């Protein structure tokens, strides 16, 4: 069954609200074509046989690969320096010998930031509505460890994943944007 969400919340819990043509690929070689979308708040895929059919949520495990357009998704267990592991569906961005870069799609519900401007006193003020906000990040797997990619170059250097001089040179030459997948893939 699909999760029901508060209709008063602005936005949606999906990476992309529309169902896209995709494929479930199982370790045993079986493949299944379907319409898919990722519910990032539940970390589940929602699946339809065709546009008219009813959607249902599916759990995947490490033996299933999901392809939607050119993107590849898999369930991973990883640790970002806390006591317990996280389990999440990650989008494969770039896999090299020593490094692997993944996108970890996440959303959270937040109350909108209050503006400092006082509204005129009409005796009625509309209560602020909660909204779905992007909380995604990039993850690097390196030497058996997992790192959440910071949004600043200074914090990136503090991770000590790369030679500082080479990183600075590469960053300047390629106008590296730590928030952009295409920029990160080089």
Regions found by a protein language model. Give the residues of each.
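Short amphipathic alpha-helical segments, especially helix-boundary/capping motifs
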Residues: 19-20, 142-146, 161-165
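Generic signal for short, ordered secondary-structure residues
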Residues: 3, 149-150, 166
């Amino acid at each position: 069954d699909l999760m029901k969400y508060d209709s008063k919340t602005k936005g949606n819990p999906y990476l992309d609200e529309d169902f896209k043509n995709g494929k479930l690929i199982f370790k045993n070689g079986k493949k299944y074509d379907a319409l898919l979308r990722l519910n990032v708040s539940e970390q589940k895929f929602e699946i339809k046989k065709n546009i008219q059919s009813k959607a249902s949520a599916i759990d995947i495990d490490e033996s299933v690969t999901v392809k939607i357009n050119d993107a590849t998704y898999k369930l991973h267990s990883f640790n970002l320096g806390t006591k317990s592991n996280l389990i999440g569906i990650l989008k494969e961005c770039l896999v090299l010998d020593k490094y692997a870069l993944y996108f970890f799609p996440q959303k959270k519900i937040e109350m909108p930031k209050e503006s400092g401007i006082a509204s005129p006193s009409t005796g009625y003020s509309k209560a602020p509505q909660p909204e779905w906000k992007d909380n995604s990040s990039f993850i690097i797997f390196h030497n058996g460890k997992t790192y959440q990619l910071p949004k600043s170059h200074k914090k990136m250097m503090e991770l000590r994943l790369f030679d500082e001089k080479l990183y600075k040179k590469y960053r300047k030459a390629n106008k590296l944007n730590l928030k952009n997948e295409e920029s990160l893939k080089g």
